[in-house]
Curated annotation (Swiss-Prot):
Family annotation (Gene3D superfamilies): 3.30.230.10
GO annotation, biological process: maturation of SSU-rRNA from tricistronic rRNA transcript (SSU-rRNA, 5.8S rRNA, LSU-rRNA); translation
Name of the protein: Small ribosomal subunit protein uS9
Protein keywords: Ribonucleoprotein, Ribosomal protein
Entry GO MF terms: RNA binding; structural constituent of ribosome
Amino acid sequence: MSEMKIVVTSGKRKTATARAVIKPGKGRVRINSVPVEIHQPELARMKIMEPLIIAKELAEKVDIEVKTWGGGFMAQAEAARTAIARALLEFSGDEELRKAFLEYDRTLLVNDVRRKLPKIQGGRGARARRQTSYR
């Protein structure tokens, strides 16, 4: 039996996590068992498609299955694009593709570490304070 190359990678954004499984195939991409072509909203779909457009020839030769959980829909989309880009890079081992990803957007390969500041007492949020009266 021939060895089938399967690569599993993950990506994170805020509290969202995505796991991508990539294997040789016909170019099918599914996000939570839904084809990426009908994934809603459109802005999230465009974010997910970015690494696939950059790695055009490779993306047509592999099937990608992405499972996302946690966070909001946009954070899930950004976690999914990171997972897809890492999977494509690990599957191909192409240094040119790595340079193309980094040149386009560094967060395709590196998780965005920004987090929400916690709310502090004396106000409604992390920075906003209650109005004070001095007379």
